[in-house]
C-alpha cells in the first residue's frame, strides 16, 4: 500500500518525442502543422455533415463520429506535448497520466468498433440495397454509436485501473511523449508479465476479431462490386470502400504493432513513431482521405462557400 501511495504522490517525467531527434524545432513545427490541419479538416467535415441535408445518411452519420474521435485523440496528447516542449519540462501528474491513458484508450477502442460498423454499413449498402433503409434506420445508427462509446469506456476503465494499480517505485522517467500502457509497464517494480500477456491476448479480441469482421464485410462487397453492370455504380462503390479500407489499414496496422507485438521486439523510438502515427497522423489523414475522394463532400463544401460568397456580396 505504501508503494501505491508513493506512486500517487509522484509525477511522471515524459521524455518526449523531440528528445530523440536532432532537429527538434523542425519536428515540432511539423507536428504542430499536422495537428492544426487535422483539427481543421475534421471540424470542417463535421460542419458539412451537420449543415448539408444530402449528407444526412447513415454513412455520414458514422463518419461524423469518426471525425469526433479524430478530434479528441490528438487533443489528449499533442497540446500537452507542445506545452512540455515550449516550457522545457515534461512532468505530468499521476492524475494527468491516468486521464491520458483513459481517454486515449477510450477513443482508440471506440474508433476500432466504429470502423467495424462502418464496414457493415458499406456491406448493407452494396450487397443488400433494398433492405438498407430498414437495417440502417436512425435507431440502429444511434445504437451503433452508443455501443462504440460503451465498449470504449469499459475497456478504458479496465486498462487504466489495472495499469495504475501497479507500484511505480523505480524510475519515474517515461520514455514516451505521453502516458501509454506499454510505456508505463516498463517502469513498474512489480511483475507485469501476466498483464502484458493478457494485453496481447485481449488484442485478439479487440483488434484481430474486428479486423477479420471488416475483411469479411469487404470481401462480400468486392464480390458484389465485380458483378455490377453499371460502371458508375461500380466506380462509386469502389471509391467509397477503398477510402474505408485505407483508413482501416492505417489505424489497425499501428495498433497491432503497439499492443500485440511484445515490447522486447520494438524500441522506445519505434514506439514513439507508431504512437504518433495513430494519435496524430491517422486522424489528420482521415478527413483528407474521405473528402478528396468523395464528390458529395466536395459538393457540400462548394455549396457552403457559395452561400458565404453570396452573403458577402449582399
Curated annotation (Swiss-Prot):
Q: GO MF annotations for this entry?
A: G protein-coupled receptor activity; olfactory receptor activity
Q: Which GO terms describe its biological process?
A: detection of chemical stimulus involved in sensory perception of smell
- Provide a GO CC annotation, any one: plasma membrane
Glycan-bearing residues: 5
Location in or out of the cell:
Cell membrane
Regions that span the bilayer: 26-49, 58-79, 101-120, 140-158, 196-219, 237-259, 273-292
| Pfam families named among the record's database cross-references | 7tm_4 (PF13853)
Membrane topology reported for the UniProt record: Multi-pass membrane protein
* Keyword tags: Cell membrane, G-protein coupled receptor, Glycoprotein, Membrane, Olfaction, Receptor, Sensory transduction, Transducer, Transmembrane, Transmembrane helix
- Stretches of the chain found on the membrane's Cytoplasmic side: 50-57, 121-139, 220-236, 293-314
Q: Which InterPro entries match?
A: GPCR_Rhodpsn (IPR000276), GPCR_Rhodpsn_7TM (IPR017452), Olfact_rcpt (IPR000725)
Parts of the chain on the Extracellular side = 1-25, 80-100, 159-195, 260-272
- Task performed by this protein: Odorant receptor.
Entry's family note: Belongs to the G-protein coupled receptor 1 family.
| Name of protein | Olfactory receptor 2Z1
Q: Upper lineage ranks?
A: Eukaryota, Metazoa, Chordata, Craniata, Vertebrata
Q: Which gene encodes it?
A: OR2Z1
Amino acid at each position: 500500500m505504501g508503494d501505491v501511495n508513493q506512486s500517487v504522490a509522484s509525477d511522471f517525467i515524459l521524455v518526449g518525442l523531440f528528445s530523440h531527434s536532432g532537429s527538434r524545432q523542425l519536428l515540432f513545427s511539423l507536428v504542430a502543422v499536422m495537428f492544426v490541419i487535422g483539427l481543421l479538416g475534421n471540424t470542417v467535415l463535421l460542419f458539412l455533415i451537420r449543415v448539408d441535408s444530402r449528407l444526412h445518411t447513415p454513412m455520414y452519420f458514422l463518419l461524423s463520429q469518426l471525425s469526433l474521435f479524430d478530434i479528441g485523440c490528438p487533443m489528449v496528447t499533442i497540446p500537452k506535448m507542445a506545452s512540455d516542449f515550449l516550457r522545457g519540462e515534461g512532468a505530468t501528474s499521476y492524475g494527468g497520466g491516468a486521464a491520458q491513458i483513459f481517454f486515449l484508450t477510450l477513443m482508440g477502442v471506440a474508433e476500432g468498433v466504429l470502423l467495424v460498423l462502418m464496414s457493415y454499413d458499406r456491406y448493407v449498402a452494396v450487397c443488400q440495397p433494398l433492405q438498407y433503409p430498414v437495417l440502417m434506420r436512425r435507431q440502429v445508427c444511434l445504437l451503433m454509436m452508443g455501443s462504440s462509446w460503451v465498449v470504449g469506456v469499459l475497456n478504458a476503465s479496465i486498462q487504466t485501473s489495472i495499469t495504475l494499480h501497479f507500484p511505480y517505485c523505480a524510475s519515474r522517467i517515461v520514455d514516451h511523449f505521453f502516458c501509454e500502457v506499454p510505456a508505463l509497464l516498463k517502469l513498474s517494480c512489480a511483475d507485469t508479465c501476466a498483464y502484458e500477456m493478457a494485453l496481447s491476448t485481449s488484442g485478439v479480441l479487440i483488434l484481430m476479431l474486428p479486423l477479420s469482421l471488416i475483411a469479411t464485410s469487404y470481401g462480400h462487397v468486392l464480390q458484389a462490386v465485380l458483378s455490377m453492370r453499371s460502371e458508375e455504380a461500380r466506380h462509386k462503390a469502389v471509391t467509397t470502400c477503398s477510402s474505408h479500407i485505407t483508413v482501416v489499414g492505417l489505424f489497425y496496422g499501428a495498433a497491432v504493432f503497439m499492443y500485440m507485438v511484445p515490447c522486447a521486439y520494438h524500441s522506445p523510438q519505434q514506439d514513439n513513431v507508431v504512437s504518433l502515427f495513430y494519435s496524430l497522423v491517422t486522424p489528420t489523414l482521415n478527413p483528407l482521405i474521405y473528402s478528396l475522394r468523395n464528390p458529395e463532400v466536395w459538393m457540400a463544401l462548394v455549396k457552403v462557400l457559395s452561400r458565404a460568397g453570396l452573403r458577402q456580396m449582399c
